[in-house]
Structure formats: C-alpha cells, structure tokens
Curated annotation (Swiss-Prot):
Note: PR proteins are acid-soluble, protease-resistant proteins which accumulate in the intercellular spaces of many plants as a result of the hypersensitive reaction to a pathogen.
A Pfam family matched in the record: Thaumatin
Entry-linked PROSITE patterns: THAUMATIN_1, THAUMATIN_2
Keyword Nucleotide-binding set for record: no
Primary localisation category: other
GO cellular component terms, semicolon-separated: vacuole
Domain of life: Eukaryota
Organism: Nicotiana tabacum
Signal peptide limits: 1-25
GO-annotated biological processes: defense response
Cell compartments where the protein resides: Vacuole
Keyword Lipid metabolism: no
Keywords: Disulfide bond, Pathogenesis-related protein, Plant defense, Signal, Vacuole
Protein name as annotated: Pathogenesis-related protein R major form
Length: 226
C-alpha cells in the first residue's frame, strides 16, 4: 500500500536517524467488546480469534514503524489457519503477515520516533468495526471512532460488512492524494467520516487533526465496539 494512502511515515523516516532510548517493548491489549466474534489482526503480531469479551496481548519492539491493528469480520479458517474474511482479510491467513484488505478500521502507530510514539485511528482504508485506541498508563489522548458508520454509509461507498473510503472506490488524486504532499484536501465524502469520527484520519493528508503523540514507553489498549 502506498504510504500516502495510510499513515504519514515520511515523518518517521526523518526521525529514524536518532538514537532509540527506550529498550523495552510496548504492550498492546486488544479487547473485543462487540456482541459478535472479531478476528483481531496486527502487523507486526499476527492474528487471533476473539469471541465477545475475549482479549489478546502482543508486545511490539521500540523503533517499530508502519504498524497497525485491526479487526476482521465473518471469517472462516481451517485447522491450518487458512481461509477468508468478509472484511479486513489478510491474504487468507489467520496469522497475518501483512496488511488487511479494505474496508477496515485501523489503529496505527510508530514507536519511539524519537522518544515519543505517533498514534492514530485511520479510516483511509474505510470502516468496519467501531474502535477505541488509548494509553493504558495515561499521559496522552484516548482516540475513538464509534459512530454507526456502516449504517449511515453513502450509497457509493457501501460494501458488504463495511463502508469503503472514497479512495478505494474512486481511485483519483482528489481522494487518494497520489500526487504527493499538498495535492489534495478534504472532500464531501471524506467529511462524512470526519464529522462522525473527528479523531480519525478521513483522507491520506488529514495529519493536522488526526496524528497524535504519546511518550515513548507507553502501553496501549485497542477495543473493538467500546
């Protein structure tokens, strides 16, 4: 996936020259509070089936960038961990090795870049499950996207099990920002997402209102259907 369609990782490349002071991994507690099963996915981290009320914890090394956590819905996997999901599928694998297929609500992060973490919720790949992304030990902001987006999704963005971002459907620079920094701005369709989830990225260059920082060494909690 083009990095301009997701998280602004050019910032992380710039900071990568600095010494990484934090040496312990960050813990991410992933909790399913939905009334239905969610197949949690993490890159890096793999994947896990979470029935309602279940949780899963992963550790992510300092210095990790371009990382994300998301939920998959309506999945079927065989005993070897091969199968498919209606939303968020990652190459038909229970244990994800890459990113998921849109639409999927994303918790994105880069750790210790430098001495602070960059975090966001992104709808640049669309929306499938309500989400909260928060620190477990304080010190920074709780991010939430809990509006009934699937039910209110514009007709041209509706898809089975979720709501597509306009870039996924229309594929022009106006929505995808493929011509580089400053090449696009908010649109009526991106505003649909922003009005309902003001904390979240609604289009690829939505950085000023959507990218947040936490102190390095923070641990996190991602909740589906908070």
């Amino acid at each position: 996936m083009n990095f301009l369609k997701s998280f602004p990782f050019f910032a992380f490349l710039y900071f990568g020259q600095y010494f990484v002071a934090v040496t312990h991994a960050a813990t991410f507690d992933i909790v399913n509070k939905c009334t239905y099963t969610v197949w949690a996915a993490a890159s890096p981290g793999g994947g896990r089936r979470l029935d309602s009320g279940q949780s899963w914890s992963i550790n992510v090394n300092p210095g990790t960038v371009q990382a994300r956590i998301w939920g998959r819905t309506n999945c079927n996997f065989d005993g070897s961990g091969r199968g498919n999901c209606e939303t968020g599928d990652c190459n038909g694998m229970l244990e994800c090795q890459g990113y998921g297929k849109a639409p999927n609500t994303l918790a994105e992060f880069a750790l210790n870049q430098p001495n602070q973490d960059f975090v966001d919720i992104s709808l640049v790949d669309g929306f499938n499950i309500p989400m909260e992304f928060s620190p477990t030990n304080g010190g920074c902001r709780n991010l939430r996207c809990t509006a009934p987006i699937n039910e209110q999704c514009p007709a041209q963005l509706k898809t089975q099990g979720g709501c597509n971002n306009p870039c996924t459907v229309i594929k022009t620079n106006e929505y995808c920002c493929t011509n580089g920094p400053g090449s696009c701005g908010p649109t009526d369709l991106s505003r649909f997402f922003k009005e309902r989830c003001p904390d979240a990225y609604s289009y690829p260059q939505d950085d000023p209102t959507s990218l947040f920082t936490c102190p390095s060494g923070t641990n996190y909690r991602v909740v589906f259907c908070p």
